[in-house]
Amino acid sequence: MGFDRDSLNYAAVIGSGMGGVFFGSREPTFWIINAISQASPLPVITSFFLLYALLGVSFKTAAIVKLSPKPLLSIYFYMTLYFVAHEFTQIRTGVAAGIYLFALHSLSRGARGEFLLRLLAATCFHYSAVVGLVMFLVPGATRARLRLFALPIIGIGLGQILTAENFEAVGTYLLPGPIQGRLFLYLELLSDERFSQINLLNPVTTSFLVLYWILVLKIPSTARIYDRYLLSSFGIGIASYYACSMIP
């Protein structure tokens, strides 16, 4: 507790009840894990974070062992880059990301129905996983390095063009209720000066950008379709980060 602001927000929500609009503000699995935590002999908050951490670590470890050609190296990068962020702070994202790794593998095998089911499971842990549908538009066997290299640049360009009104229109007409509510909440935070001072070219995001470009240049022509999907997903994630930079 107190590791970051998210943990304090979760503590305020846990045990506050279910129903109405407040229930829709979180995914179904959030309330299921909350209910299990209430019945646990351990302190509620301890059980809550422990259950999410166990799920996140289990899904990602299973995906690494099954899908990575170099599992030890993959586990090293997971522990150094994502473990704290996913299993200590962004706990819902952490579980959804683990399931998403399996979903992409389904898509790489051409099993689109299985991909949708697994993506639905990921969305039940974090609504934002629904954006994974964009991977349907990505040719699995693409070798267009220039196109992949340009993704972050396109995102940066869009970030200079898009306005709060654009995002509000998308939220109003295209997004389902729960995701729409979160978007509008973030748009309201634009009035907070703390968020206007965020440096998009901070060392962490810049290091991810540089790493992505290195991978684009170095990926072999014989790389697995699954690896190409992972790289494309990485690039789309970075592009989305820059394109939506005006949202806190």
Labelled PLM ranges:
Residues 10-11, 28-31, 142-248:
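Alpha-helical transmembrane segments and terminal signal-anchor/GPI-anchor hydrophobic tails
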Residues 41-55:
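Loop-to-helix entry region of an early transmembrane alpha helix in multi-pass inner-membrane enzymes
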Residues 100-114:
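Membrane-interface transmembrane helices that cradle and orient dolichyl/undecaprenyl
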Residues 8-43:
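Short hydrophobic/aromatic helix or loop-helix immediately within or flanking a transmembrane segment
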Residues 83, 114-138:
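Membrane-interface alpha helices of multi-pass inner-membrane proteins
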Residues 88-94:
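Short acidic/glycine- and proline-prone juxtamembrane loop motifs at membrane-interface regions
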Residues 2-9, 90:
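Transmembrane alpha-helix boundary signature
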Residues 61-81:
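Transmembrane-helix signature of polytopic, membrane-embedded enzymes
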